[in-house]
Swiss-Prot record:
E.C. code: 3.11.1.2
Protein name as annotated: Phosphonoacetate hydrolase
Family matches, as SUPFAM superfamilies: Alkaline phosphatase-like
Family from the record: Belongs to the alkaline phosphatase family. PhnA subfamily.
Function: Specifically hydrolyzes phosphonoacetate. Does not have activity on other organophosphonates or acetates.
UniProt xrefs under PANTHER family: BIS(5'-ADENOSYL)-TRIPHOSPHATASE (PTHR10151:SF120), ECTONUCLEOTIDE PYROPHOSPHATASE/PHOSPHODIESTERASE (PTHR10151)
The protein's enzyme class: hydrolase
Quaternary structure and partners: Homodimer.
Recorded GO MF terms: metal ion binding; phosphonoacetate hydrolase activity
Reaction equations catalysed: phosphonoacetate + H2O = acetate + phosphate + H(+)
Textual note on the cofactor: Binds 2 Zn(2+) ions per subunit.
Organism: Pseudomonas putida
């Protein structure tokens, strides 16, 4: 078996112990802190003694797909190409959903590990990520969302519902993430993969603030699984795809800037196009509202004028040109607009008011997407060495850290 693999200009030492990398969707660090303070996460609390607790930056836009793909490629979106759920194809003049693996421009560490002879397992909460994360992977790969459709031929495992002892959970539930962890434990005990990647959903974080009973119960559940993985002898590495913040005013009303309406009023209809890369089929979570938007300008709209106009709107943190955004956030130039707009911590960006269904938001809006959700945990159940070689820790360094930097 190959002991070293090279993927996207980085080298990875193959582990001799089962290694589990966990992406906790929407894990603002305060969730962990509050759960520990409430006595709900005793295993995580102990990691300061025998593990390593660090903080890193996620990819901006701080959304699920760009960050999960960065983690499994060890590279930013400028390399792997996935910079949101949607992009505007200038050739076809259509908004394109990027859930298909054909939009992935780089190999994954997971697929390369499997090619090197390792048993690799991937369990995601939502099925939208499975095709991307499982691209060219010969191993185990399935989602909790469609666990009842798992087959040995397509997914590398079977009878997962019976093994886990849970029914298929609702997409809009904490149970969807618990299914991921329970399935991971079953795989660890029975198949004992060399490497496992577990990715949850941020349903709880979108609905419940850090320290609330619901949030603490969710983190207590995860903590119990982390402990069981540790007791099974696994190397456990935990990070997040992004943080999470309230996007409301003082009395809980959503702070939304409908950029398409504002731009239409300023320049006229059909002169600009606002695209929200957070948009996905699961809008109940966030109403397709996040703190990042990209804007396409027609020829008649001067770029400098549009920048000044958008930057002058209260709640807008920054407006960047395409080249500025690609340089600062390492994004693919052909998949973002002429401008990138970032909302402040308490503000989300929409397109037009009539394009957003907010009826599913039964609690004050919480979302992500901006720089304000960039800080994420990097937590390990082992001591690490050689960290001086990192100028800046990123969530997509986690596989490198787990495989190459154990003491």
């Amino acid at each position: 078996m190959t002991q070293l693999i090279n993927v996207n200009s980085r080298s990875y030492r193959l582990s001799s112990a089962p290694t589990i990398v966990i992406c906790v969707d929407g894990c603002e660090q305060e969730y962990i802190n509050q759960a520990i303070q409430a006595g709900q996460a005793p295993f995580l609390a102990e990691l300061t003694d025998f593990g390593t607790v660090l903080t890193g930056d996620c990819v901006v836009p701080s959304f699920t797909n760009p960050n999960n793909l960065s983690i499994v490629t060890g590279a930013p979106p400028s390399v792997h190409g996935i910079c949101g759920n949607f992009f505007f194809d200038q050739e076809t003049q259509e908004e394109v959903l990027m859930n298909d693996a054909k939009y992935l421009r780089a190999p994954t560490i997971l697929a390369e590990m499997a090619k090197a002879g390792q048993l690799v397992a991937v369990v995601t909460a939502k099925d939208k990520l499975r095709n991307l994360l499982g691209h060219q992977l010969k191993g185990i790969c399935f989602s909790a969302e469609k666990a009842d459709q798992v087959s040995l031929e397509e997914h590398g495992v079977e009878n997962i519902l019976a093994r886990v002892g849970m029914p298929v959970p609702s997409v809009y539930s904490a149970d969807l993430s618990e299914f991921v962890f329970a399935a991971g434990l079953s795989l660890l005990i029975n198949e004992r993969p060399d490497f496992m990647y577990l990715s949850t959903t941020d349903y709880v974080q979108h609905k419940h603030a850090p320290g609330t009973p619901e949030a603490n119960a969710f983190y207590a559940m995860m903590d119990s699984y982390f402990k069981r993985y540790h007791e099974q002898g696994a190397i456990v590495a935990i990070t997040a795809d992004h943080g999470m913040n309230a996007k409301t005013d003082a009395i809980g009303r959503p702070n939304i800037l409908f950029l398409q309406d504002l731009l239409d009023a300023q320049y006229g209809a059909q002169r600009t196009r606002v695209l929200l890369p957070i948009t996905d089929p699961y809008v109940v979570h966030h109403g397709a509202l996040g703190s990042y938007a990209t804007v396409y300008l027609r020829d008649a709209v001067p770029q400098r004028d549009a920048i000044d106009f958008l930057a002058g709107i209260a709640g807008v943190e920054a407006v960047l040109t395409r080249s500025q955004a690609c340089q600062r956030f390492e994004l693919p130039e052909d998949r973002i607009g002429d401008l990138v707009v970032l909302g402040e911590r308490l503000t989300v960006l929409g397109s037009a008011a009539d394009k957003h269904d907010l009826s599913g938001l039964t609690v004050p809006l919480r979302s992500h997407g901006g720089v304000s959700e960039q800080k994420v945990p990097l937590i390990f159940n082992r001591k690490l060495v050689g960290l001086d070689s990192f100028d800046r820790l990123r969530n997509f360094d986690i596989i490198d850290l787990a495989l190459n930097h154990l003491a």
